[in-house]
Amino acid sequence: MIKFNFVPIFNGTLMKTIGKNKSSHQMRKQLLMLMMIAGLTMAAQVPLDSCRNMALRNNKAILIANEKINAAGYQRSEAKSAYLPALDLQATYLYNQKNISLIAEDALLPTKSFNPATGGYDFNILTDPTGKPVMVNGQPVPSQVALLPKSALTYDIHNVFAGALTLTQPVYFGGKIKAMNEITRYAEDLAKAMRNKAMEDVVYQVDAAYWQVVSLRAKHDLAESYVQLLDTLNYNVNAMVKQGVATKADALSVAVKLNEANVDLTKVKNGLALSRMLLAQLCGLPSTTVMTLADEGKQQIDDTSMPATTYNMDDVYARRQDLNALQLGAKIYEQKAKVEMASMLPQLAVMGMYSVSNPNSFNGYANKFAGAFSVGAVLKVPLWHWGGNYNKYRAARTEAVIKNIEIADARDKIELQVNQASFKTQEAVKTRFATMSNLEKANENLRIAKVGFKEGVMPVDNVMAAHTAWLKANSEAIDAQIDVLLCNVYLSKVLGTMKY
């Protein structure tokens, strides 16, 4: 077990200096003892606010919620960038095993000559002595041909390079870009609301664990006092048995009660140790850490003010983080419906591009780099999708309606929570006053029983009954006091006024 907030007042340098003085062995021992005593006695008491702060700093759920806020912020920045032009660079390299040839072999092409008689160009046809064209397989034979070599139509594409720098500017996307920006803004607010709700939950858990430790510590002290009372009674009864003024049965009855009290004390010790472990874990400390709480050992913690009976529910709704999260969720679904509506509207974007390639064909085919600018627009108009896009829109609208119904249901439940918490707090305060009055009577009853037993006019059974009533009254007073504190914490939680 380690003691929380152990405060050393001597550092290692001072200890080394003392250690060098061999002639002051006794002084070193005294200083070491002083250091140990000072370190132990200066262990600070931990108030409730410190436990809350440690839990808020170390709680994993809150750390995750903070990262979700960061992620939502990044997504919002991403959505804003959709308003701006996008600039992209694309480059491609392609290796081809073979070249491209448009003809399989050298080609012979027929030629034409100008005919003054017709004023046009006629094919140069081979004619016989009679002047008729020579025909082969039904086709005239040209008298002259032009050679088109295969190499002239063979292109080197072994290494192909291409690249493009493209600038795209959205002009109209049916309101989709604006809706996405609204979604990300609401999503960031939603992440913050969920973080705040997680913080409220952690604070409530820490408060419950803190007051549980205080309660069990008070019951531990009460159990020890009860054991001491019974131990004194047991001693007195045994002395009376020896004097013959009490029976053996009286002594056995007291001994049984004493054993039961010791068993109860052990149970309280175990419960207190487990409660301290839970509190340390909630604070982000090792479970073996022992913290001395500021409210431990206090005889009375005054917090018995009667709560209000009516509240402005509109103010409560505005402060509740869970309701705020639901409202933001409904807004997100409303924007999602707009996104689906945008899928049924035209989309227009303009673009500019500079492309370069090697080989290129801008001025004949050449194996070198060359490029050109291009400017254009892209228009997309949805025409017919068999109702698919419209059904997506209707589904999104339905989700928004569901969220609004959930909000109305949450409002009803919050109002019920507030009324129940207020009623429970009022009853806890009334119970607290009743237990305080009962405790005064139990203390007086125990005092009278002790006096009567001492004077010999009160039997042992009545004395033990007075002890039992005193124990019960004190235990109920402790429970009532802690219950008032926890009810006030829960009431502040449901009202949205919890401070942390």
Regions found by a protein language model. Give the residues of each.
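Periplasmic alpha-helical coiled-coil/stalk elements that build and connect Gram-negative outer-membrane
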Residues: 74, 193-315, 424, 428, ...
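Amphipathic alpha-helical coiled-coil segments
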Residues: 64-79, 198, 204-221, 239, ...
